[in-house]
A protein has these predicted regions:
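Bacterial N-terminal signal peptides
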Residues: 8-19
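Glycine- and hydrophobic-rich flexible loops that cap the catalytic core of alpha/beta enzyme folds
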Residues: 248-258, 263, 274-432
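Substrate-recognition/specificity elements adjacent to catalytic centers across diverse enzyme folds
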Residues: 25-239, 245-256, 260-270
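Proteins synthesized as precursors that undergo proteolytic processing into mature forms
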Residues: 300, 365-396, 403-404, 480-534
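Gly/Pro-rich active-site capping loops and adjacent beta-alpha segments
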Residues: 39, 43, 48-96, 279-330, ...
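Acidic, low-complexity N-terminal propeptides/linkers enriched in Ser/Thr/Asp/Gly that mediate export
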Residues: 115-227, 235, 391, 403-420, ...
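N-terminal secretory signal peptides that target proteins for export/translocation
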Residues: 1-5
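Hydrophobic alpha-helical segments
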Residues: 269, 354, 393-507, 581-585, ...
Length: 773
């Protein structure tokens, strides 16, 4: 995307079939575009800046936004055809099975007048851009216009309720296992769950060098459509995760009533992670189980299910989809949709004697947009908590800091109220008995019942997708698991949260923002710190008995600094070894750890994880696995040497920072990549703070990056307002060949951030173009 002089003439709405009949009441506004394509949107009121946000999102992400709309409508096959391997058809069937389009319209009606004004203003901005710039809307996307308020609520529901929640709770893998072998296969399922999660730190004044609260927010998600691993039809559906950074300023530009900055998902009419001059917040994925699968027992006709000793009829409806054909015609396809009292039926067994129904939280909470605008406008912790107490967001931890020196943590979302005798082991990673009414949750906890902490004694809160119990150490009583039902969350602390908590708790002097940034950018592999010593001892001993490969591996690992810095040698060998070990744990060749394995399987440790020593355990390798651990090390040495020319290859020789551009209505991947730079940063299981998710491409002989460290905000709340810096690794645009896909990479590569522009004078000085809307 380049800003092209911006035609001022308003073209007739009929050019693209747009209607202004339901336009929101707004005033003229102005967008100041900075050099990184961040829109600084000025207007007199909320509807005006929201209209500008819709306009700006189209300017930066028109193809991605309209693709997201098409999918959330359940009509992508109608617009784009069946897709590779029938992807679009299957996706639309899923959206319709979930009932997203109809419920999205209900949310519009139920959400109240304020929310409707925001939704309509955003749509007006989207449609205004399309009307002004018809040549910038690809022919294959024009039929999707105009965008209407229910498109925004359907996108919200599709992304949060029906994508985030099921993926976090491992629903897709569980369904696949059940279809292959029923409940026994589910119980045997060896899970490899990576927390598509984040880092969030709130640092109180006592730990801050300037005596001001500091907030570090760092969501870890796929890099939207700017990542390289999907080569057709955006089949990975990563566009739903694409951030856009924006600055919304209301009132007098020099003394605004609101000056809010941050990011939102494409299609979002609010700031989802961000800050104003008084406070800020970030989110991390929490260990909440609120997307549950229930096994239904069907009668002989397959049309009724057993519930509480009585057979109830499955609700049956049909939906007719249009599927675009290569010759331009449309083929109609009818699908059957079934619902039980639990939720939509998502799978049947082959004999149609059993089925799975999926129940997700938050479907009766229509006012997410209102909640986030209340959060954005808050100036104090009580105001912010009052806004969040609406619990319209079914998910996420919240980490918060403010100008008054407060820090706050909330285990947020819609937490089901379950029978008191259930434990986390009973409800996580399983299929519930759909015949038992006691297991069907109908209520969720109130805000006051959720784990939370305000200004804990350690003067920090830190969450990296760990359960709430270890988010503040020393542990305050409000985060003591003994005070909550045992089914809320398991007890564990993986290596990345240990890394962050150790950094914050071990600081011997108050931290500057520069020191916080250094900690946030750490590529140290905490996993390696715990196990490499035992591995070297094992390999050295084997070398003395003639295993020259083990001896060579030991030499590399001994010299390694345990980081994933681009110039560090040894990390790729350790990575290859660990991946083989995890595969052997899954295959039963290596005995598994049971103390700290919620996200990813671990081999048995010599010292297991302990809640009494949460940031120093687990450690070591259990000797019972030594033989296979050594086999895997020899294999890893051979594999690494074959793949990269040397087993001592540096991290950046094996791993590259890769961003791409896409073309066409369905956003086909374009070669060559826009970037191919030596990377610093490892995958989550290894325990770095700076996470980058790798994907090995054999044809390239390297790992490419597809997610992880995306948005970063580091904000200090001074008496004069918020000051700090931000970064969006994969850029603030996704339009074909946009220069703003890669223009923030120099910051990412150098592990720095760009300044957050917080005053009108700074915005004016940095503006490369100015646009009225």
């Amino acid at each position: 995307m380049t800003h092209r002089g911006f035609a001022r003439a308003f073209l007739l709405a009929t050019a693209l079939g747009l209607s202004a009949g339901h336009a929101a009441t707004t005033s003229p506004g102005t967008i100041y575009w900075d050099q990184y394509a961040v829109p600084h949107i000025y207007g007199p009121d909320i509807p005006t800046v929201v209209r500008g946000l819709g306009y700006a999102q189209m300017e930066n992400h028109a193809e991605s936004l309209l693709n997201n709309v098409a999918r959330a409508r359940g009509r992508s096959a109608e617009y784009f055809g069946p897709g590779t391997s029938n992807f679009n058809v299957n996706y639309d069937m899923q959206v319709r099975t979930y009932g997203i389009p109809a419920r999205a319209q209900a949310w519009v009606a139920q959400g109240g007048a304020f929310q409707l004004s925001v939704l309509q203003a955003f749509c007006d901005g989207v449609n205004e851009y399309a009307t002004r710039n018809p040549s910038q809307i690809l022919p294959g996307l024009q039929a999707i216009l105009p965008v209407v308020p229910s498109d925004i609520t359907s996108g919200e529901m599709n992304t949060i309720n029906w994508t985030f929640l099921p993926e976090q709770d491992d629903v897709p893998a569980t369904i696949a296992a059940w279809q292959a072998g029923g409940i026994p296969a589910v119980k045997k399922l060896k899970r490899v769950r990576k927390p598509e999660g984040s880092n969030g730190w709130g640092i109180g004044p006592a730990k801050s060098a300037d005596g001001n609260a500091i907030l570090m927010g760092n969501p870890h998600l796929p890099w939207g459509n700017n990542q390289p691993i999907s080569d057709s039809d955006a089949d990975q559906n990563f566009g739903v995760y694409q951030w856009i950074e924006a600055n919304l300023v209301i009132g007098n530009p020099n003394s605004p009533t609101l000056n809010a900055s941050g990011v939102t998902f494409i299609g979002g009419p609010f700031i989802g992670v961000g800050f104003n001059d008084y406070l800020g917040w970030t989110h991390t994925n929490n260990t909440i189980q609120n997307a549950d699968l229930y096994q239904l027992t069907l009668d002989s006709t397959g049309t009724k299910y057993l519930f509480g000793g009585v057979y109830l009829p499955l609700q049956h409806t049909t939906s007719v989809m249009k599927v675009l054909q290569p010759n331009g015609s449309e083929q109609l396809q009818s699908i059957d949709i079934y619902n039980s009292i639990h939720g939509p039926v998502v799978a049947f067994n082959a004999a149609k004697t059993q089925a799975l129904a999926l129940r997700v939280a938050g479907l009766n909470e229509p006012s997410l947009v209102t909640q986030y605008w209340n959060m954005i406008q808050s100036q104090t912790l009580p105001q912010f908590k009052a806004a969040e107490s609406a619990l319209q967001m079914p998910f996420f931890n919240t980490i918060y800091a403010d100008r008054g020196g407060n820090i706050f943590y909330l285990f947020g979302g819609q937490q089901p109220v379950r029978p008191a005798n259930l434990t986390a082991a009973d409800v996580f990673n399983t299929v519930l008995d759909g015949t038992n009414p006691a297991l069907l949750w109908t209520k969720t906890m109130t805000f006051a019942q959720l784990p939370q902490a305000v200004n804990p004694p350690g003067n920090f809160v830190a969450n990296s997708n760990n359960p709430p119990w270890t988010t503040a150490l020393p542990q305050p009583s409000t985060l003591d698991p003994a005070n909550y039902p045992t089914y809320i969350a398991p007890s564990f602390m993986d290596f990345r949260p240990q890394h962050g908590t150790t950094f914050l708790s071990s600081a011997t002097a108050p931290l500057t923002t520069a020191q916080v940034l250094t900690g946030k950018m750490s590529n140290e592999m905490y996993l390696a710190d715990r196990v490499v010593g035992d591995l070297i001892t094992l390999a050295t001993a084997a070398g003395k008995t003639g295993d020259t490969t083990a001896a060579a591996a030991a030499a590399i690992l001994t010299a390694w600094d345990h980081t994933a810095d681009a110039t560090s040698a040894g990390g790729p060998l350790f990575e290859a070894w660990w991946n083989l070990v995890v595969a052997d744990v899954q295959a039963g060749k290596i005995s598994a750890d049971t103390s700290d394995s919620f996200y990813s399987p671990h081999p048995k440790f010599r010292v297991p994880w302990s809640a009494s020593a949460p940031i120093t355990t687990p450690s070591g390798l259990d000797p019972s696995n030594n033989a296979q651990l050594l086999v895997d090390l020899d294999a890893a040495y051979t594999q690494t040497a074959a793949a990269f020319g040397s087993a001592s290859v540096v991290w950046g020789g094996a791993h590259k920072t890769t961003l791409v551009t896409r073309s066409g209505a369905t956003q086909q991947l374009v070669f060559p990549f826009l970037s191919d730079l030596p990377l610093s940063g490892a995958d989550d299981p290894f325990g770095p703070i700076r996470v980058v998710n790798p994907y090995y491409v054999g044809a390239l002989g390297q790992f490419v990056s597809y997610g992880g460290d995306g948005y970063v905000q580091l904000i200090e709340f001074t008496p004069n307002g918020a000051q700090g810096s931000t970064l969006l690794t994969y850029g603030n645009a996704s339009r074909p060949n946009s220069p703003h896909i890669t223009d923030q990479l120099p910051f990412f590569q150098s592990e720095t951030l760009k300044p957050a522009l917080r005053t009108f004078s700074a915005v004016q000085a940095a503006a490369v173009s100015v646009e009225g809307f």
